[in-house]
């Protein structure tokens, strides 16, 4: 991008403008003069015929480059739990599930949000790793909103004014929970924060090219050739604007921050679609697509056992559960059990 800008400045005698060195810098400068320059660069490349014949070194086929995560280590990732009606009580009997959905429609409450580790982010084509001994790994496709302007106490109707664009995200989840003993609540760090649990990309589409997510969103996830999830925004409990409004009431949002909109029904822990729980296994391939943005593609592999002499680590699920996908084994009195997934 910097090379293309320098070439245009020389050939077109355009005013000099510094190009930021990373995506967060691009996002922060986008509405402060950079957007017009990027448009001009693209138009110049197209109109000069640089896409055909002999190309300058800064014009390449997408297949000739490796597509990294757009923001390899975001400052902050906030995800929204259970924000699609079809994801409510997915593993409950039909009557109980219908009741839970009706109750939520009658009282939506406020979004339920959690932080995801920035170190979990990987780009399309990178491998999702099942941690050693963890046999209940799940998939969730989400629309991720990228903040473009600082936001604090913004209203839902004005929230999209603070958005830079949108990308695809997978919220990979370890549903195995904590072993018995100690703290008894849901361990969100175990479930959501481990390495490779935050695939993101392949691109960020600026909001002016994507449109209103509440009318545009269509997302689909496949494991192999089997479609596991498909949804649009009509299934969402809180809109993208409402989620940003709530998030900005808790913390100051800055350019490059990522906000996941939540996932729909069809995740592995749910029984309402397939009648049984199904988990990711080594050799699986995930294809996650949001229309108008792009597709994430990831293979799944199992991590080896930790090396001898390793200190404390999360034990294999088989040491405190009766087997893959089985109900929790009985725990000693007063000990912790398995937390519910989100």
Predicted feature descriptions by range:
Residues 66-69, 101-104, 128-137, 142-143, ...:
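A generic local secondary-structure boundary/capping motif
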Residues 94, 112-131, 151-152, 196-205, ...:
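Short catalytic-site patches enriched in acidic/histidine residues
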Residues 70, 136-138, 252, 279-280:
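Residue-level "contact hotspot" at macromolecular interaction interfaces
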Residues 83, 116-177:
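Non-heme Fe(II) oxygenase catalytic core, chiefly the N-lobe of the double-stranded beta-helix
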Residues 87, 173-334, 339:
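Catalytic-pocket segment enriched in acidic/His residues
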Residues 95-122, 139, 280-292:
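Structural signature of FAD isoalloxazine-binding scaffolds in flavoprotein oxidoreductases
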Residues 1-107, 111, 285, 307-309, ...:
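N-terminal non-catalytic cap/leader segment that marks the start of a structured domain
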């Amino acid at each position: 991008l910097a090379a293309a800008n320098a070439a245009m400045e020389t050939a077109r005698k355009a005013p000099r403008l510094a190009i930021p060195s990373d995506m967060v810098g691009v996002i922060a400068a986008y509405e402060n003069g950079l957007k017009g320059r990027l448009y001009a660069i693209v138009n110049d490349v197209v109109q000069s015929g640089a896409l055909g014949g002999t190309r300058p070194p800064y014009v390449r086929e997408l297949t000739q480059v490796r597509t990294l995560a757009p923001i390899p280590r975001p400052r902050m990732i906030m995800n929204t739990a259970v924000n699609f009606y079809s994801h409510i009580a997915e593993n409950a009997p039909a009557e109980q599930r219908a009741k839970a959905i009706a109750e939520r429609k009658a009282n939506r409450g406020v979004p339920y949000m959690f932080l995801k580790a920035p170190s979990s982010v990987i780009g399309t084509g990178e491998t999702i790793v099942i941690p050693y001994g963890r046999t209940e790994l799940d998939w969730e496709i989400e629309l991720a909103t990228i903040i473009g302007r600082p936001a604090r106490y913004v209203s839902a109707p004005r929230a999209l004014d603070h958005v830079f664009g949108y990308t695809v995200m997978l919220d990979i989840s370890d549903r195995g929970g904590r072993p018995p003993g100690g703290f008894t609540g849901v361990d969100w760090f175990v479930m959501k924060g481990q390495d490779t649990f935050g695939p993101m990309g392949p691109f960020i589409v600026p909001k002016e090219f994507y449109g209103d997510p509440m009318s545009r969103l269509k997302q689909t996830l496949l494991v192999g050739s089997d479609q596991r999830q498909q949804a649009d925004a009509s299934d969402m409990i809180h809109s993208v604007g409402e989620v940003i409004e709530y998030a900005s009431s808790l913390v100051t949002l800055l350019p490059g921050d990522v906000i996941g909109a939540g996932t729909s029904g069809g995740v592995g822990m749910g029984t309402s679609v397939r009648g049984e729980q199904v988990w990711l296994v080594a050799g699986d391939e995930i294809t996650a697509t949001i229309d108008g943005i792009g597709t994430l593609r990831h293979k799944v592999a199992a991590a080896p056992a930790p090396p001898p002499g390793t200190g404390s680590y999360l034990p294999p699920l088989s040491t405190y559960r009766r087997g893959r996908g089985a109900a929790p084994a009985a725990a000693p009195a007063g000990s912790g059990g398995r937390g519910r997934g989100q």
